[in-house]
Amino acid sequence: TDESVDVFYSCTVCQSYAPDHVCVITPQRLGLCGAYNWLDGRANYEINPAGPNQPIMKGRTLDLDKGEWEGVNKFVYENSNRKVERFCGYSLLEAPMTSCGCFECIIAILPLANGVMVVNREFPGVTPSGMSFGDLASVTGGGAQTPGFVGIGRLYLSSPKFLAADGGIKRLVWMPKALKEDVRERLQKEADRIGEPDLIDKIATEENGVSEEEVAEYLASVGHPALALESLI
């Protein structure tokens, strides 16, 4: 778990086209491209100590709920061309991780639904945010820190640390049907863990709505737990 280690790992492979981006890989949050997890980062550093995967000493805990550590902030600042001053690993709204352009999925806030949507690269349509994956990528990528939008690896969706500071998986209100089925088994385990065994079937897909208003109506009809959480904004 993130609590059981003192070291995270960085990945800066994508700085050639997103020079201010630093990926922070933890035991419970893999790289946003989906290709690197914490064990990969450790192994790559041992093989190539001067490579793009460097150890990040967590240091003093600043906010455990949001996933903010003094050592991580220092590392990210020094390795983002001094552009990114803070990093909160478990929040979409406060100092989220930057994104390059290689993300498997994009998380975006849906204020009317009091939750977030996720879309994968393969989905060709327009999402309830009013944007396609490509449109969202132009907002999210490039190394800028954009509260409300973040790129992720799809397996992060089922992590106990997924948006833990913002309400976790209970905030997930819309995703493409194909993506839902692809990660259903993993999501179900997390839903069971938090005592919401029916959650996965309450998450809307393009079959239930493609506008934020339609999604909000669907959530109300099925009693999605996001509607009972405090306002996201």
Locate the predicted segments by residue.
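Cysteine-centered metal-binding/redox modules
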Residues: 1-233
